[in-house]
Amino acid sequence: MTFKESDGKLVCTFAGHFDTVRSQELEATLRQRLTAPQPVVFEMQDVTYVCSAFLRVCIFVAKTAGPGQFTLSGLTPPIKRVFMMAGLTGLFGCD
């Protein structure tokens, strides 16, 4: 996991599996970093698995970032399917 500020956005780049433990670590980190609404991008092209705890983190970020300010970028078809099945693609941008 890497985090950087770019053009006023928090860009988070991820790789590998996001199981419950890793998702909880991510949530703790983001709760410290996101103290006010700001655009957030999750770069997901190298993510191979997400569990429901990761989906919960995404919902938290979408609410904290503000309306239309959270984007998932680089979703592979299997990962995008998880978000579609959970009905979350309308809550935030998915490309």
Where in this protein do the model-derived segments appear?
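Amphipathic alpha-helical interaction surfaces in cytosolic regulatory modules
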Residues: 20-92
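Short beta->alpha connector loops at strand-helix junctions that form conserved
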Residues: 95
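STAS-typified acidic loop motif
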Residues: 1-28, 46
